[in-house]
Amino acid sequence: VVLVAPTSLDFDRARFAANCFRDGAAVILNCESLKPEETNRLKDFFTGCVYSLDGTMRRAAKDVFIMVPKGVGLDEDSQDESEDEA
């Protein structure tokens, strides 16, 4: 599992986490320290990564997202009801 908790918009670190995801690691993206527009940019970046690799992305909290690669399940009970906003 790779934890990404940026304090500013950092695509080098995001690229590292995306490469880990591509290689089969789950990624937790904690954007609580970012501005809303920065959160949206990172969320969009990772949404594209997850989609292109047939993974799954779920909202765990307001600005926290969990991404798992294809073939790895998520406990449905842990999903936030607002997942559609992710």
Language-model-detected regions and their locations in the chain:
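Generic recognition of short, well-ordered alpha-helical segments
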Residues: 16, 40-41
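Positively charged, small/polar-rich N-terminal and surface patches that mediate targeting and assembly
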Residues: 1-27, 32, 47, 51-86
